[in-house]
Amino acid sequence: GVGSVVAHKCAQASLNGAFGHITLASRTESRCRKIAESIRQRYGVEISTAKVDADNVPELCQLIRTVRPFMVLNIALPYQDLHIMDACLECGVHYLDTANYEPPETAHFEYSWQWAYQDRFREHGLCALLGSGFDPGVTNVFAAWVMKHELDEVHVLDIIDCNAGSNGQAFATNFNPEINIREVSARGRYWERGEWVQTEPLSWSMTYDFPSGIGPKKCYLMYHEELECLALHLRGLKRARFWMTFSDSYLNHLAILKDVGMTRIDPVEYKGQKIVPIQFLASLLPDPASLGPLTRGKTCIGNVMRGVKDGREKTVYIYNVCVHEDCYKEIGSQAISYTTGVPAMIGAMMIMTGKWNKPGVYNI
């Protein structure tokens, strides 16, 4: 998954002196050891591993004080963001993540919980960098670059995320199944003329003709966290939306699972035990980390931005194309994890070199 990509890319960068010692920690240390062995075989770099429960702040603090890192890269679940931020504050280390906080009991995410840490991180002289993945992350950088170099005002922003790859599975997610299904099943939301407008889940769609030989694909309107930040900072913005492609097979399976209650996030009674259906479902689905050798095709993620330059209307499309097979050949991962993990490594490098190291809590 993404954690493996981040560890591999940080190890690669350490060969050039960008990073010192790396410790990879997880609730399941055996997975960390497998990643560490892959890194040793590929690059000759030794990294440490550790077992930690990211929901347990004292346990996190004990590990941080033992390792004494410059910063913590949080590639855990969004539910754990605040616990890890608390531990970083207590131990005096910088923080980075790739996804904003989401409470386990509610399928709703927003940055307000993490932005509330602004004063505490600033007072401690620590930097917390939020959303250092691809979307959010690189899509924010794309927007800032276009605003700086291509447009005087941005009137319309459409972020479009296409996975044109195939893994041959009837139903599988390319990152944590529980998080993926919660996100896709939620109501859509977009920003227009200063207000948030809600839509029913996956009720709006459009067809977009993607570059690099991908061609036309159906895209569905969703809510994605970078919209919350970009709506505040893009000069002249009138509308901002996020779109993602899904196969018919994925959507059909998802609809059936929802109809029979398997996407519920509340506990249910089963033979005297409380279980959460979506968590049980996630345990049955393929591990996203296992999909690398099975996945073929390309991803294309980018921003379509329409606005004004020198008084004239102008549209800019800035995007990235990644090939699943190339990612697997390089580090044993599919492109979804790769495109999230590489920006996390770059964000960490920017903090460690001081280029982005400013006390407080910031989005890319």
Predicted regions and their residues:
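Rossmann-fold cofactor-recognition segment
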Residues: 42-56
